[in-house]
Regions:
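Glycine-rich phosphate-binding loop used to anchor ATP phosphates in small-molecule kinases
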Residues: 77-119, 123
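Conserved substrate/cofactor phosphate-moiety recognition/catalytic segment
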Residues: 42-93
Length: 194
């Protein structure tokens, strides 16, 4: 039996999704990974301009479940149990999804691979990166109050997390958001259409 907390949390997140796209026979799950400030949310927003996908942005979803997030391991564990449950339920309904989260550990990504494999969903993996100088400027602008989305991460968080990045062991796209992202967007749109 599933944890009632997970189901309750996933329901709260579902209520905030708004209008859902039309279901498809074989939905796609696009998992976007990368350190804070590398441009994951920007990349996801550009992708969503071209694909009618639901974006599940972990930073925004965290703030739905926790009004004053602490980013503790316990909080993150609860958040991602709810996100994984939500992904599973939406894929079962034929909803195409983009998961926008750091997704730095292969063990955590394995859970997503298993969900996609079990539900026969197409899985597309994307590693987003940018040079440390570009990331520093983006995070500095974020800390100075420039509108940068839902993330609270700063340069210190980036520095701490960069040592936890694990290689993606499956085929994936790599995109440097300090350069033109159009070629990778084009490839992903084509892959979704196949």
């Amino acid at each position: 039996m599933e944890d009632t907390q997970v189901i309750s949390d996933a329901q709260r997140l579902t209520e905030k999704l708004g209008q859902l796209p039309e279901p498809v026979v074989k939905p796609t799950l696009i998992v976007v990974s990368g350190l804070p400030g590398t441009g994951k949310s920007y990349f996801c927003s550009k992708l969503a301009e071209r694909l009618l996908f639901i974006i599940l942005e972990s930073d925004a979803l965290r703030k739905i479940l926790f009004s004053s997030p602490t980013y503790s391991l316990q909080e993150s564990s609860r958040l991602f149990r709810a996100i994984h449950h939500l992904i599973e339920e939406l894929l079962k309904k034929g909803m195409p999804l983009i998961l926008d989260a750091t997704n730095l550990s292969e063990r955590n990504r394995e859970r997503l691979y298993n969900i996609a494999d079990r539900l026969n969903a197409k899985l597309i993996l994307v590693r987003v990166e940018a040079s440390p100088g570009v990331v520093y400027e983006r995070l500095k602008a974020r800390s100075e109050g420039m509108p940068q989305g839902n993330s609270d991460a700063d340069w210190a968080v980036f520095q701490r997390m960069k040592h936890t990045v694990q290689k993606i062991r499956r085929n994936h796209y790599a995109v440097d958001t300090s350069r033109d992202i159009t070629p990778v967007l084009d490839k992903i749109v084509r892959e979704v259409s196949r």
